[in-house]
Amino acid sequence: MFPLGSVVEVITGERGFVRYAGEVENRKGVYVGLELLPEFAEFGKNRGVVDGREYFKTKNNEKTGIFVPFDKCKLASSISSSPSPKIDGTAASIGMGFPPMSPNLQSSIPRLTNVSSSSNLSMNTISSTALTPTEKILQKRIEDLLYERQNHQQQLEEVLATVDQLQSLVTNFNDQQDEVDELRERITLKEERIQQMRNEASQRRFEFKTTIECLEESSNRAIETYENRIAELEAQLEMYMSGKSEDDLLFSLQQERDYALNQVEILQERVDTLMKQKANSSTANEKLSHMESSSPTLTNASFESPKRGKGSNDLPENHPQRRQTLEFYEIEIEVLREKVEKLQALSDEKDFYISKLEKSLDRNDTTPVPSDEKLSNYAAEKENLVSRISELEHTIEQLTINNERDNERMSPAEFELETTQEVEENDSDSHDDEETWCEVCETNNHSLQECPTVFGSTDEA
């Protein structure tokens, strides 16, 4: 048997290193697996693989392997320079366990290829016939050492290549670390923005839910109010359709007419009050301007008083804003007068319908009419009167709202110069009527819960 790594020569003249010695599958006898020398590489037949089974590996996985029967090869007579054989996978993985080396380490390591090969050249000239057994042993030892040197050199080159690769990876990692930090920061900002948007969405859902609940509650209240009003109207209609007497109908119409006239008188009184307030305001402003011009102390006190606003009464008499305010009050008063006249016209029209009903009653006394036809006529007349009354109530309501707005727009300074007696009377009246005061009609005849303007007239029931 030839030792592994020894140089063997085939009978055909090819030389190579012994990589395998033993049996080959599906072959009889003992075979020697050789990795041919570079000068005989063209005669190679395989890469150390036979029938799919790998027996050895060739350098760079080249096709330089050959299997020869043991009896057709012999030990080479001389030593020649041989290429660095390819080590197996276990030897190639040795370099991965070394620690990182500095970039200058590769240049500082001496290359084994620089060693002079004069000893090899001189040994090639030694004839195999002139070697003694001791020299043959030494020759074998030299061949083994050369083979080990080639393996070590190859391992060192692979380690240096691995170091270079690791250094490039470290450099790339340092370059990419900044990008990774930037990406992490952007991800953090995105997460904060997403959390903020989620909080805003939750708040909006809560507000929307609260608004929906408020709307539902308001809708339920309005529905309940309308249902109660509809029930009252249906009850009134049933009472009218069941055969209510003509006298009762006429009496209710007269009461409604009186109520409308009362409302007209109240509105007329309000118009007169506004006119008086306007006259008192102009007189008070003249007195106030005279007092301010005559007394500097009073002027300073008036400006320092927190109760006096900066309305139109604080301005001089010939100031454009003051004149504009007075003109506005005059326009409002004219509008109220027109509405009062319109209400008076509606009241006259209602009187006409009442007189017409009285005539029809007188005529019915002489010429009786069937009860069904009479009730239908009364129902039609009643519907007309109800529509007229609703229009009148709507007009009164609008007039009341406008009057309240006018009272809100008036400056508090207009009422500062009223007499003490009028203030006390108003305070006593408001105190007496506090329990039964209607904010819509501004009267003490009934409370807000019993207001006919809002819930309809109680006389209809």
Curated annotation (Swiss-Prot):
S-S bridge residues: none
Start and end residues of each stretch annotated as Disordered: 278-323, 417-437
Gene3D superfamilies the UniProt entry points to: CAP Gly-rich-like domain (2.30.30.190)
UniProt domain CAP-Gly: residue ranges: 22-69
Residues forming coiled coils: 134-418
GO molecular function terms noted in the UniProt entry: microtubule binding; microtubule plus-end binding
Modified residues (Phosphoserine): S82, S84, S289, S294, S305
Keyword field contains Cytoplasm: yes
Compositional bias ranges of the Polar residues kind: 278-303
Domain of life: Eukaryota
Location in the cell: Cytoplasm, Cytoskeleton
InterPro entries, alphabetized: CAP-Gly_dom_sf, CAP-Gly_domain
Record-level GO BP terms: cytoplasmic microtubule organization; establishment of cell polarity; establishment of mitotic spindle orientation; microtubule cytoskeleton organization; protein localization to cytoplasmic microtubule plus-end
One GO CC annotation: cell cortex of cell tip
Keyword set, alphabetical order: Coiled coil, Cytoplasm, Cytoskeleton, Microtubule, Phosphoprotein
Function: Has a role in stabilizing and targeting the growing tips of the microtubules along the long axis of the cell, directing them to the ends of the cell. Acts as a cargo for tea2.
Assembly, per entry: Monomer. Interacts with tea1 and tea2. Interacts with tea4 in the presence of tea1.
Protein name: Tip elongation protein 1
